[in-house]
Amino acid sequence: MTQFSALALLLIVFVAASFAQSYDDVSAEKRAMRNALVRFGRASGGMRNALVRFGKRSPLDEEDFAPESPLQGKRNGAPQPFVRFGRSGQLDHMHDLLSTLQKLKFANNK
C-alpha cells in the first residue's frame, strides 16, 4: 500500500467517525423528543404541545442557582402545565400563601 492510499484511508476513517458522532447527537435529540411525546401524551395535542412543554430550553448559568436568583424556586419544582394564554403570575401565588399564613396565624391566636 502506498503512503497516499494509506493517508486517504485514514482520512476516510476520520470523516466517517465524525459523521457517526454527529448522527448520535441527532439520535439522542430525537429520542428526547420521543420521550417528551410519551411523557405528555399523544392525545393531548401531540408534537406541538410537546415542543412547547419540553422543547428548546436554554442552558442555565451558574448564577441562576444563586439564592437570590428568581429561578431558584423553579430549580427542583415540578414541571408547570401548559397554559394556552400564559401562566398565572407569581403575585397570585404570593397572595395565596399570605392569605393562608394569615388564616393560620388567626387560628393560632384564638
Curated annotation (Swiss-Prot):
Record's keyword terms, sorted: Amidation, Cleavage on pair of basic residues, Neuropeptide, Secreted, Signal
Tissue occurrence: Each flp gene is expressed in a distinct set of neurons. Flp-11 is expressed in the DD, VD and DVB motor neurons, the PVC and URX interneurons, and the AUA, BAG, DA, LUA, and SAB neurons. Also expressed in head muscle, socket or sheath cells and uterine cells. Expressed exclusively in PHC sensory neurons in males. Expressed in AVK and RIS interneurons.
Spans annotated as Disordered: 60-85
Null mutant phenotype: Does not affect the body bend swimming frequency of animals. Exhibits normal pre-molting cessation of pumping. Larval locomotion quiescence reduced significantly and nose immobility reduced to 14% from 48% in wild-type animals. Photoactivation of apft-1 increases nose speed during quiescence in contrast to wild-type animals, which significantly reduce mobility. Shows higher RIS activation at the onset of sleep. Shows diminished RIS-induced body elongation, briefer slowing response and transient stop at the onset of RIS activation. Reverses more immediately after RIS stimulus onset.
One GO BP annotation of this record: neuropeptide signaling pathway
Glutamine amide PTM sites in chain numbering: Q72
Compartment annotation: Secreted
Signal peptide annotation: 1-22
GO cellular component: extracellular region
Keyword Signal (UniProt): yes
Phenylalanine amide, modified sites: F40, F54, F85
Pro-sequence residue ranges: 23-29, 88-110
A GO MF term: neuropeptide receptor binding
Domain of life: Eukaryota
Keyword check for Signal: yes
Reported function: FMRFamides and FMRFamide-like peptides are neuropeptides. Induces sleep-like quiescence behavior following release from RIS interneuron. Helps to sustain locomotion stop after gamma-aminobutyric acid (GABA) induces fast slowing response. Inhibits the late-stage body bend swimming frequency in animals through several receptors including frpr-3, npr-4 and npr-22.
Family listed: Belongs to the FARP (FMRFamide related peptide) family.
Protein name per the record: FMRFamide-like neuropeptides 11
Organism: Caenorhabditis elegans
Name of the encoding gene: flp-11
